[in-house]
Structures are given as structure tokens and as C-alpha cells.
């Protein structure tokens, strides 16, 4: 019995030692112990190294096989070295090809144009995007371009028209300003040798009727100071007139039913200042001859302040001192530089300025 017990203890001690040794060499899950195989681990390391060597990027051009592990990611991704990516012709898979920088792959030589580094299809798309009009350019276009420059034969006429206006409007306004007036001043030549007949075509007399028409009320006020026969003056304005002639003399006066005459005042008395020769010449008699088709507003400014019939002086008749003084003041007003007519003593030139 003792021998059996000793042998059992020896067996149990041996089994425990083996279990401890087995536990030290592997893992025990339940009744199964998994041991690590040293040869298996070595084989796995070899497989990993083979895989790493097989995945190393190399240039796919025949005869190059350059390692691309230490170059830029672009070249290692597309498996082409820097030199062959810019070459005009390489051999890949037994064909003459070229690397396209837009597609990032090799194409046949027929797909390229001359020395272009991109294929024809990608260049067409690129040029189409660049030539497409930008929407912001329409904001900077000027509205002057809408006017056709060919209207005036000048490429800059559109800008000139928009800034200065239509040139045709200026020409139309100018033609209206140069239009001859419907009235005429014709002094008689035999009255004075230095006076010439004036034509009605001068453009300087064009605005006279408008000035007379606008100042008709002022002349009536001035007439009311000279005489009390204001209704007679209104009747004179209603008579049609279009011709002016000086009388045959400075002291004589011709009065008819269809004429209105303003005579020269009588000789100045000694207590009043004398009138200069120029003033006496400008105060000569003017006759207003009635016309057929003209209106009363075409009369000269002098005629509108002419004296009425009862204020005319001829053949030595005299007027009152106060009335004579007013008559002289009116004559001085029209003999100022801006109202008088410039006169030249030469018989060839006679300048009238309003």
C-alpha cells in the first residue's frame, strides 16, 4: 500500500511538473493548451517582407524600373518617374506612348498635338472653359455702346452724342437762328450820301422782332410820360409796317394818313446844354410806311417811343420846357453805347449794331 501511494504521489508530482512546464510554454483554455510554434512565426515574417517588396512602386516604363518609394506621392501613385513623365515618347506595354499630365496616365501618340504635354481631348475642354464669357463682364459694359457709331461715320460719335447731345439738333437750331426776318430796313439813298441800303438777309437783325415784341409794354410806359395821347399810340401800333425810310431833311416833316413821323426837336434854347453833332444826326426824322403783310410788332425800337401826332414839331413850333426835357432824356437813353448804332463816315461802310 505504501508503495502504491508513493508511486501515486510520484505520478502526481510528475504530472504537476509537466503541467507547469506546459503552462509555461502555452495558453490553456479549458482542457486544451495552445502552444506557439516558432517556425510558423518565422514564415509569417517572410510573407510580410515578400508582400512589402511586391508593393514597392516602380516606374512602369520598360527598361527603367526605378524605385519610387522615396519620391513624391504623385509619381509613386501613377508609377512613373519624373524624367519619363515629361518625355515625348516612351515604351509602355510594348507600345509607343506618352504620359498625359491632365489625365495622369499614358496615351498613344496619335492623341497628342505636336509637343503638347496634354492630350487633345483634355485641351479642348480646358480651352472651352477659358473662352466661356464671364457673367461679371456684362456689368462693366457701358450703355454708350448701344448707340451705333456708324450713324455719324465716327467711331467716337456714340460718346459725343451721349455727352453733347444730338449734333442734328444743333444744326437745326442754328438754321432757325440764321433765318431772315420778315421785316426790312431801307433808308432812302438820296436823303444822305453816306447811307447805304441794308438787306434783310443779315442774321444780326433776326432777333429784333422778338425783342420789340417783349418790350412793347415798356415802350408804352415811356410814351405815357411824353404825351397824353396814349390811345393814338395804340392805333399806331396796330397799323402794319415793314419799311423804314428817313425823311428828306432834318427840319421838314411829311405827314400823311398812313405815315407816322417823329420830327427833330426845335433848336435848343440858351439855358439848356447844346446837343452834339452826333446826337443831332441820330435824332433825324424817321417815317413809318404802312405795309401789307407784316404786323405791328415788327417795328423798330425807335418807332415805339416815337412822338404822337399832337406832339410833332415842325415849321418853328415850340414845345413846353418840361416836355422838351423829357424828349431829350429819351434821346440820350438811346444814344448810349449799347443802344446807339455805330456810324462810319466813309461812304463805303455803314455798320448797324443793335
From Swiss-Prot:
Fetch the PROSITE patterns from UniProt: ZF_SBP
Summary of the function given for this chain in its UniProt record: Trans-acting factor that binds specifically to the consensus nucleotide sequence 5'-TNCGTACAA-3'.
Q: What's the entry's take on its domains? A: The SBP-type zinc finger is required for the binding to DNA.
In this chain, Zn(2+) 2 is annotated as bound at 100, 103, 107, 119
The record's listing under SUPFAM superfamilies reads: SBT domain
Q: Which cysteines are joined by disulfide bonds?
A: none
Q: What is its main location?
A: nucleus
Its lineage reads: Eukaryota, Viridiplantae, Streptophyta, Embryophyta, Tracheophyta
Kindly give the InterPro entries that the UniProt entry links to this protein.
SBP-like, SBP_dom, SBP_sf
Q: Which residues bind Zn(2+) 1?
A: 59, 64, 81, 84
Select a single GO molecular function from the record's annotations and give it: DNA-binding transcription factor activity
Composition bias type Low complexity, residue spans: 7-25
GO terms for cellular component = nucleus
Instruction: Name the gene that codes for it.
Output: SPL15
Q: The motif Bipartite nuclear localization signal: which residues?
A: 116-132
Induction details = Negatively regulated by microRNAs miR157.
Cofactor(s) this protein cannot do without = Zn(2+)
The entry's localization annotation reads: Nucleus
* Alphabetic keyword roster: DNA-binding, Metal-binding, Nucleus, Transcription, Transcription regulation, Zinc, Zinc-finger
Which segments does the record annotate as SBP-type zinc fingers?
56-133
Q: Does the keyword DNA-binding apply?
A: yes
Which stretches of sequence are listed as region Disordered? Answer: 1-25
Q: What's a GO biological-process term for it?
A: regulation of cell population proliferation
Extract the Pfam families matched here.
SBP
| Organism whose genome encodes this protein | Arabidopsis thaliana
Q: What is this protein called?
A: Squamosa promoter-binding-like protein 15
